[in-house]
């Protein structure tokens, strides 16, 4: 990629934790799409109560993988079973390192026997691009990287537009767009529907936990498709709310997907060491940030495995071999952490916010609706002063009237337990996304994933009885 590699930077800087905790790349940006079309509260409300339109055209990488060995290549480098991966289906694709550490994830679509489309964040794209060359596979890969974070007025073009319509009134819009009932598309299956004069592919999907379709097509059709969707919503009498990038980043909180685990590639020999030599100094992996109250000298303490994220049911154990299989077999017999939702105590959140209006050093600011200030977040979750978990992605839900975060806890932690989240960093770093601050302790109640208001109400007394 470039003459200076991630491996060279690590040799120069030493500990990868210090490299990433002091990166000055700044806040993660969802590019091009306006921050708000109305206001982020109304936009969050819409995916629960009416219908919302997400523009997903710019913030994700896209890979088109085709060729005689396309299926074999992707199966070998992902944990997923490909046994039932028929045409016009999609999967949540998860690659791991030979040591079993999660690298990232993509949504993968099978368009032909020998052609797949994958969309998602950079770590998985980078890994697959490397693996295609490293293993001398007979595949062709077209890489369309995400749009620039700060295009500075330059025109931005992509291979495909990508929209998602979700919410309880979404079907009314679909029927109006399609000029009649849409096909009965099963979850994570794909079919064709009409939008105006165009036939487009539609995936049954729902990122925020509400029913919906994800649609895509040639980028040059984007304006036409957008206007056709808005016209159909108007004809259907549905108040379709366009969602900006501020609210979009929080939609995963209610559905339970952790979007940005730290790629587990900073340690390891063999192909992972070669990968670090291949990755450039400008890559996501070299320039991204770690933020939060959890600090360890061992970068592997920030890694997660598929069992911890709830992805173990994806694993294709019957496959002859795939990268990481031996390591996952060993992990399967061990006790692993589990994914949960943390519900932040409102009084403690207000205490943190109030400190910004007081003299002296405030607590770390909680931005709304998205307080994350690093590419990968890692906040300590404690019980009686002992670390029992890690909060990895947080935000405010107007629908639930709560700050929530997603993360992992030790296996013996129970739903309903009230723990302590350490908010803010104990020592200053060079990150441009943090101000001078002090740490706060925030009580968090362990909740199910996906999170639901019914679960919160069942434990309503816990905030009053547990201090």
Q: Regions from the language model: what does each represent?
A:
Residues 1-92, 101, 339:
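Acidic, proline/glycine-enriched N-terminal capping motif
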Residues 84-86, 95-101, 106-112, 154-155:
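Short, charge-rich binding segments
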Residues 59-66, 97, 107-109, 116-121:
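Short secondary-structure transition/capping motifs
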Residues 74-76, 104-107, 119-120, 128-131:
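Short, conserved acidic/polar surface loops in the N-terminal third of protein domains
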Residues 43-49, 95-105, 194-203, 388-391:
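Short amphipathic beta-strand starts and helix->beta connectors
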Residues 1-35, 112-467:
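Conserved, structured C-terminal
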């Amino acid at each position: 990629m470039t003459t200076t590699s991630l491996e060279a930077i690590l040799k120069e800087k030493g500990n990868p934790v210090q490299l990433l905790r002091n990166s000055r790349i700044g806040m993660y940006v969802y590019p091009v799409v306006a921050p708000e079309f109305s206001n982020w509260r109304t936009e969050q409300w819409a995916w629960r109560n009416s219908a919302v339109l997400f523009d997903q055209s710019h913030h994700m990488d896209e890979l088109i993988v085709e060729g005689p060995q396309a299926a074999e290549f992707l199966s070998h480098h992902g944990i997923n079973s490909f046994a039932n991966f028929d045409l016009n289906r999609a999967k949540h694709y998860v690659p791991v390192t030979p040591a079993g550490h999660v690298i990232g994830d993509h949504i993968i679509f099978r368009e032909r026997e020998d052609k797949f489309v994958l969309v998602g964040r950079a770590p998985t794209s980078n890994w697959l691009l490397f693996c295609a060359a490293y293993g001398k596979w007979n595949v062709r890969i077209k890489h369309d990287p995400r749009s620039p974070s700060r295009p500075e007025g330059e025109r931005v073009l992509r291979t495909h537009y990508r929209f998602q319509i979700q919410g309880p009134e979404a079907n009314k819009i679909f029927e109006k767009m399609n000029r009649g009932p849409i096909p009965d598309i099963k979850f994570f299956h794909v079919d064709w529907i009409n939008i105006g004069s165009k036939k487009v592919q539609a995936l049954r999907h729902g990122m925020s936990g509400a029913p919906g379709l994800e649609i895509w097509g040639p980028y040059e059709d984007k304006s036409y498709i957008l206007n056709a969707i808005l016209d159909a919503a108007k004809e259907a009498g549905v108040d379709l709310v366009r969602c900006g990038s501020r609210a979009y980043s929080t939609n995963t909180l209610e559905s339970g997907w952790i979007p940005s685990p730290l790629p587990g590639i900073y340690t390891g020999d063999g192909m992972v060491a070669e990968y670090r030599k291949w990755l450039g100094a400008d890559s996501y992996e070299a320039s991204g940030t770690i933020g939060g109250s959890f600090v360890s000298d061992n970068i592997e303490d920030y890694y997660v495995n598929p069992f911890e994220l709830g992805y173990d049911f994806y694993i294709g154990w019957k496959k002859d071999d795939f990268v990481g299989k031996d390591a996952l077999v060993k992990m399967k017999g061990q006790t692993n952490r589990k994914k949960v939702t943390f519900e932040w105590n409102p009084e403690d959140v207000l205490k943190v916010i109030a400190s910004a209006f007081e003299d002296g050093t405030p607590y770390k600011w909680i931005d709304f609706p998205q307080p994350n200030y690093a590419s990968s977040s890692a906040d300590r979750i404690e019980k009686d002063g002992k670390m029992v978990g890690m909060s990895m992605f947080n935000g405010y839900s107007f629908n639930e009237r709560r700050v929530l975060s997603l993360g992992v806890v030790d296996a013996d932690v129970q739903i309903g337990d009230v723990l302590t989240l350490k908010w803010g960093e104990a020592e200053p770093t060079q990150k441009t996304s943090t101000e001078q601050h002090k740490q706060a302790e925030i009580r968090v109640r362990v909740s199910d994933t996906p999170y639901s208001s019914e679960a919160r109400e069942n434990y309503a007394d816990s905030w009053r009885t547990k201090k």
